Amino acid sequence: WYSSMFAANIKQEPISHHHHHHHAHHSHHQHSHDSNSNSNASSPHQSPLPSPNPPSSNNLQLEQYLKQQQQQQQQQQPMDTLCAGAMTPSPSNNDQNSRLRPPGLPNPMQTIMPANMRPSPTATTTATTTAAAASTTTAATVALQSNDKLQALTPPMDVTPPKSPAKSQQSCAEPEKEHDLMSNSSEDMKYMA
């Protein structure tokens, strides 16, 4: 999930460069992990206690498994900081990354981002749509009222004059509506950030 989002975000960066980095990290960690497991495996062979071998080998497997888990978590972290660093070109992400990284979780982006990102888009969309609906209705009512006033003010004249002011009033209300939408969305963004 987040890797696809992250890949989409990275498009402006040279992808090969990023992947190369990722691989460098990966192979480096793989190597250290291998040497770790080797030293672990060699130490029990050196110990001259063959009798409690089954339980100790069991424990060893468990230990190695745990170590591997830790190693994997650590392995993901450079990827995350790398991903966060690579995502910094877009400013909106910058904010979220700086907030997402401080909690010292093994995998901050994956654990927090779904929780952070999934509810918030719905929240913002509902907020903007309601705001947009409100602004359009207000603009429409304003236009209607002024139309009524114009027509009420100019009944004795011909039918064409009230129409042209009505048109200009419409075009006047149109940018206003867009401005409302813009200010609303920017306020939402401020609220989000």
UniProtKB/Swiss-Prot annotation:
Gene Ontology terms describing biological process: segmentation
Compositional bias annotation for Basic residues: 17-31
Domain of life: Eukaryota
A molecular function GO annotation: DNA binding
Subcellular localization, as worded in the UniProt entry: Nucleus
Comp. bias intervals (Polar residues): 89-99
GO cellular component entries: nucleus
Segments of skewed composition (Low complexity): 35-46, 56-77
UniProt keywords, alphabetically: Developmental protein, DNA-binding, Gap protein, Metal-binding, Nucleus, Repeat, Zinc, Zinc-finger
Location of region: Disordered: 16-126, 146-193
Segments of skewed composition (Basic and acidic residues): 174-193
Protein family membership: Belongs to the hunchback C2H2-type zinc-finger protein family.
Function summary: Gap class segmentation protein that controls development of head structures.
Protein name from the UniProt record: Protein hunchback
